[in-house]
Amino acid sequence: MSNFRDSSSPRRGYSEFDPESGEGLGRKKSLIRPERSRMDESHPRFHYTQVANQESNHIKVQPSSTGVDPRKSNELSTSRSHLSNYATPPHQEEEEDEGIPLMDIHNASPNVSSDQNNDLKGGREVYGLNDEINDYGSSPKKNQVISSSRPMNNEKPAKPKHDIYFWKVYCYAITFWAPAPLLKLFGLPTKDRQFAWREKIGLISCILYVGAFVAYLTFGFTKTVCSSQVVRTQINHVNGGYLIINGRAYDLTSSQHPKAAGIQAGSNVLYPPMNAGGKDASFLFQNVNGNCKGLIKPRDNCSIPYDGDELAWYMPCRLFNQDGSTKPNNTFAYYKGWACHTSETARDAYYKLKVNGDVYFTWDDVKNSSRNLVVYSGNVLDLDLINWIETDDVTYPELFDKLRDDETYRGLDISLVLTNSEERQAARCLTEIIKVGSIDTDTIGCIASKVVLYMSLVFILSVVVVKFIMACWFKWVTSRKQGATMYDSKAWAKRNREIEDWVDHDHGIGAEVKTVPVKARANYKAAKTNRQSVFHRAQKLSLGPNADLSQYYDNPNALSKTFKYTTMSTQAALLGRNGYGKRGNNANKSVSGGFNGRQSNLYLTDQGSSTDLLNRPVSSYNPFDSMGDDSIVINGLSPDIIHPDVVPQPPVEYQPFGYPLAHTINLVTCYSEDEEGIRITLDSIATTDYPNSHKLILVICDGIIKGSGNDETTPDIVLDMMSDLTVPRDEVEAYSYVAVAQGSKRHNMAKVYAGFYKYNDETVPPEKQQRIPMITIVKCGTPEEASAPKPGNRGKRDSQIILMSFLQKVVFDERMTSLEYEMLQSIWRITGLMAEFYEIVLMVDADTKVFPDSLTHMVAEMVKDPTIMGLCGETKISNKAQTWVTAIQVFEYYISHHQAKAFESIFGGVTCLPGCFCMYRIKAPKGSDGYWVPILANPDIVERYSDNVVDTLHRKNLLLLGEDRYLSSLMLRTFPTRKQVFVPKAACKTVVPDKFKVLLSQRRRWINSTVHNLFELVLVKDLCGTFCFSMQFVIFIELIGTLVLPAAITFTIYVIIVAIVSKPTPVMSLVLLAVIFGLPGCLIVITVSSLSYLVYFVIYLFALPIWNFVLPSYAYWKFDDFSWGETRTVAGGDKGDHSAVEGKFDSSKIAMKRWREWERERRSTENRKQQQQQQLTNNSSNNLAVPGAAWDPSNTGGNLIDDLSQGSSSGSS
């Protein structure tokens, strides 16, 4: 396909965020040619390429900047999706360089024939997928169901076993002692449960391995590599119980000396009369005739016994003080050679003495000016002892005197000074006769242990300090610039105090809900004037209130310069000058005035057809509006089904917060919540200050569930909060869809209720009630499970997939289930918008209250930076001081946001966007040519998140317990170069568990899902940074830290106890602990707006054994528990998981058609009904014409938006 870039195309503001949207040449981001990459199911762009290839006959796909086109591939796979029925083509590497033109703002490709242009077969323009052609031979049959080259009853082709073979063998090997019968006896009847238990034991063993390694590294490594069993004693500190001989200390306290001259038999030489204790006796056991042989020679008149060059001794055999203060004395006490121990018996007795320690000198000792000491090869030599040599009897080399007399050598290491062989032999000789000890040095092992210790210390401190610094930077600099408004320091601190006041007391200036103009209120009805006139199309619609915008179309670049950022609405405005709506013979046809095909159809009107694209005071813009005969081609949904009281759409240039508004779906998933919890959530979303024209509430009830303590089922509670339903409540039908489950539960049914949110005047005053469109989807289950305890229940992930799969079908114009078509039609009924208009999804749990301006700041961040694919706000605790269980959670919540998420947000890689309050981008603008990149609606996200094959412990923990965190991880894996950030300006509050058993159950799910998601993320190689300075390495450290939490807190307590009861005090360990636990406390003092958090910090410290030992240990032992436990309880329900397989999936019950086929079928049915009715009424001629728009702007009096001043004078009904 051709590239739609044009040299004259305007460059809008969002391009600055996307450096790849320029015209520069060169390969981007990767040294590997993506077109040569391996294309299999493990590739992050695999499913996207499948869909792009399958739907390439009616959508345009922009190749990446590397030239890769997913539609042109030689490698195709036979694998198929479990939610769709497309074939498997290849994919391309860089998703940022590819896109789908949800709006082509330039001319059609020159390579596309004119016929294709007329039918829009070759491309996809504006917001729709216009693949309808006159020849229906290639269209799917009306009753076509899911088809495939293989039976759909098979859940999914089995994966090769070789990748998990080793793990299975290991699990069976380590649990060999627990045979299957024994496990069955202990309540594990099925093979799946038994193998899950074996996997649990295998994972626990791995955790023990990691903990043992950390323990060894902390306590055992030094002892292993630096295991010096000999005690080392510093010189001048050798006490009287030891005798020093040749630099070694001997314990002679229990020795007995044989009878000798002056010595009685059995006496101890350490005591009187010898008094040798603590002295140096090296001259009493001289090393002679070794290295000194040939150097120290006898004189001719030598009185020392000798044999050739061998001498009996060199110095007089006397004791001298260890401090070297003894002067030379060449006399003998009793006779010549007395005490020299030259006999074989004396020598053997000496050699058998046990060495109790080495005597060592520090460098300060060596440099002692009172002694003449030098170091040679680690040995300390006392050169003054040369003076003891009996020079009258022997001769020695002149080098001895030179070394002794040269002051420059004193206190130095002379190992490198003595270089030639003669000098080295002389040095070895001196080592044998005048060595007094060893220099204070460590062995290689000891040095290595210290290096490891200090490197670990530096690394841990670096991580902690860098996180602290980054968190402070984020708080003081980055966060103030986020969102719709930039605050200075004082205003930012004031806002934080307002949020805290709102959390604690549910009031505050910033939390006040604004008054709503009368005509925008929930109780205002169009029927108050003339409801039927809304549908009357007797007169042509004109430019009306937006006439001032016509100036932009005289200057092609004027409008594009108006919009700094890109949204679907701004691109709709740009259509006016690019001739959208040229179809067949109507392309150059003037309906209300003459204009050619290049002119906008801004003024184009038609009976039951398009109106002014910008002049839409009612939000009834249908990008598929018919411009031909509907009996031949279905180009759009019928405008006659639009609700008369839809919320008006403001002009496209309306920017109340300084950025173009983006349409947002507010998804609220419900399970067993009570009325109060659901009402609080829906009230807070409905009353946010974000314009109600751009927000839609979508509530999905996960089954017919009655929460514990509730009088009604959850669906009934929600439906009681709706009014003005498009279809009466008791007439709504159930529609089929493919659920995220296995076996017969893959077929599920749901009902779609469309209307508007119904406030309670006691919770929200009438003057503050915005009119909000609302859709409720109730998963009611198939008729076969009507009597089951929880009919329709498939889990929260299935609820999310209902929306995500629907958005994918809309973006790619794929075949839809009947439920998805009903969703498309319901959105059209209550908003007048096609679903493609929506760009953002806010996900909120049904027990969360949102701060009034949170949605505004979150959408602002999305619109201003198209590279952001997901973000989250701050979750506050509303019941802080309810019990000790809630109190210990306050600081944990705070630090997880303002340290962990703040640090990750600096690098755009927040690893967990909490499902209770987060926002995802459905699609992102790409370049200036109208292309959009599917994000949340990306097939790779939808297919992998909807995976129903959960046959391993790892996948069950990912998909059944931690689906919210898994979605965040999946987004980072699929789009590693895009951002997930934290926006503290957006705040919400929720009620946390107040009972320990509930907290235990909740954290069991969170911890286990965290471990498995971190393991997934640590394998992502494309995250920012390199080696140790990368998010991947930080995630690896976080994974190890999570696994060893129980061991770490045990080591911490041990170190503290050792520091108290023993010596020496482990100073470094205590400093490390102080930094690790102290910096978070400093973070509170520096950044928090309420000092009460310091109290909760102290409480958190006392609760550390619970957080770091009790909770993770319990979670690890419950690795094979996939239930939600005590977190969500239902009346009469169980706590089972959604992984059970029951029955077989019958695909024939689920029809899959494109939305046009569904619409054609609906219109045909209605036409038949009308014909039958006309026959019954004798063809009455007073029927109303089919309406084409939901609102006549001539009724507004020229005003699109009511002024607040009207609120005082206008009434409401």
Curated annotation (Swiss-Prot):
- Give the Enzyme Commission number: 2.4.1.16
Give the catalysed reaction(s), semicolon-separated: [(1->4)-N-acetyl-beta-D-glucosaminyl](n) + UDP-N-acetyl-alpha-D-glucosamine = [(1->4)-N-acetyl-beta-D-glucosaminyl](n+1) + UDP + H(+)
Q: Which UniProt keywords apply?
A: Cell membrane, Cell wall biogenesis/degradation, Glycoprotein, Glycosyltransferase, Membrane, Transferase, Transmembrane, Transmembrane helix
Key word Disulfide bond present in the record? Answer: no
Topological domain (Cytoplasmic) residues are 1-168, 222-450, 1038-1039, 1087-1213
Name the membrane topology term: Multi-pass membrane protein
Q: Extracellular side: which ranges?
A: 190-200, 472-1016, 1061-1065
Against SUPFAM superfamilies, the record matches this protein to:
Nucleotide-diphospho-sugar transferases
Q: Name one GO molecular function term.
A: chitin synthase activity
Its GO biological process annotations read: ascospore wall assembly; cellular response to mechanical stimulus; chitin biosynthetic process; hyphal growth; protein localization to bud neck
Origin: domain of life: Eukaryota
What the entry lists under CDD domains is as follows: Chitin_synth_C
Instruction: Give the transmembrane ranges.
Output: 169-189, 201-221, 451-471, 1017-1037, 1040-1060, 1066-1086
Major site of localization recorded for this protein: membrane
Q: Short name of one Pfam family for this protein?
A: CHS4
Q: Where in the cell is it found?
A: Cell membrane
User: What Gene Ontology cellular component terms go with this record?
Assistant: cell septum; cellular bud neck; chitosome; extracellular vesicle; incipient cellular bud site; plasma membrane; prospore membrane
Q: What does this protein do?
A: Polymerizes chitin, a structural polymer of the cell wall and septum, by transferring the sugar moiety of UDP-GlcNAc to the non-reducing end of the growing chitin polymer.
Family membership noted in the UniProt record:
Belongs to the chitin synthase family. Class IV subfamily.
Q: What name has this protein been given in UniProt? A: Chitin synthase 3
Biological classification of the source: Eukaryota, Fungi, Dikarya, Ascomycota, Saccharomycotina
